[in-house]
Amino acid sequence: MENPIKNNLIIELHVPDLSVVKSFYSKLGFEISMDDKPNNKELGYLTITRKDKLGNTMLNFYGGDERVYGQSFFKQFSKDTRRGYATEITITTSSIDELYKLAFTQLKQYIVRELKELKDHGHVWKDFRMVDPFGFYLRFTELIDWGQK
């Protein structure tokens, strides 16, 4: 599959500690694009980008301290609620083997399914799964046909 996915979807993940985000995701090749630190008036906002020949992956994080738990919608849930329940964040890469080696070397404890080849609906690809320090479920995968044109 060679057609990259082109869309304008913005993923924003609410977290209480942006330094944990920086440490974890930088080990997977993400770089900081924007870093607005929390202050007395406002929570912080962090944008990270992972460059790949298939296209860049951008993730956005909001929060940075305990005030994130007071967000208008999410405040109805306990602080201990696992982040991202029933959601999979899928990140395509042209270099799945190299990325897996990086993850295995630096973040092995977060891998919840090792790299393996899968077959489904006529597609064959490799992927692996991780859970980040906040509980967001991440799938790193080779590009397959999701209907992109």
Region locations from a protein language model:
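Active-site-proximal beta-strands of protease catalytic cores
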Residues: R139
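Vicinal oxygen chelate
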Residues: M1-I10, E31-S94, Y100-V131, E142-K149
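Short alpha-helical segments used as structural interaction elements across diverse proteins
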Residues: S19, H123-K126, F136
